[in-house]
Amino acid sequence: MKRFKLFHKKISIINEVDRKNFFIRLIFFTLASFLYGIIYNTFLVPNSIVIGGMSGLAIVIKELTGLKTSIIINICTLVLVIISYFILGKDKAIYTIVGAAIFTLLISFTSTFSYSLQGYLKNEFLIILVSSISIGIANGIIYRSGFNTGGSDILASILNKYFKIPIGQCNSIINTFIIMSGAFLFGITKTIYAIFILTISSKMIDIIMLGVN
């Protein structure tokens, strides 16, 4: 019951921010996406830590094909955004189009200099801890901004529309598949790191969305 109330409180917050100043929310979304891009390209990609979502899937595909993660994310997101425009409608797609464009651009941009930051943090535990907190902060701000980064969220919305599976459950299924793919390719240790990051970051998201209490 408590989780049910928290979920609906999150939804009400997201609906509320949709009515607030577009450009202020856009600035916060951009800053949060920039932070996510730095952490993703500096720590997650080099260490092959798959935490789900399109960014996690990109690490898996990179291992299989050798393509850069930024290129994979750009291609997959573009395809999903186009599909969402026709399937989900223009009204639902507009925030996804804007958000996905900024997010993928910043993922590509941060990948150009993130390698120069890798030497500043070499302790494995600190890498996981910093990644957990930073990703939680970034995602929390992204959710509060009312924008959508695209990726697996689009796929979940499409599955929800046609198969009537709750979006949260769709996301769980998709992310579980991606994380298990990472476990198969990179081993159980990397998967434990990913689960730790997801657990801590989800707590950070709750703090940003709902407050300390």
Task: Show where each model-derived region lies.
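Core subunits and conserved enzymes of cellular information-processing
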Residues: 2-213
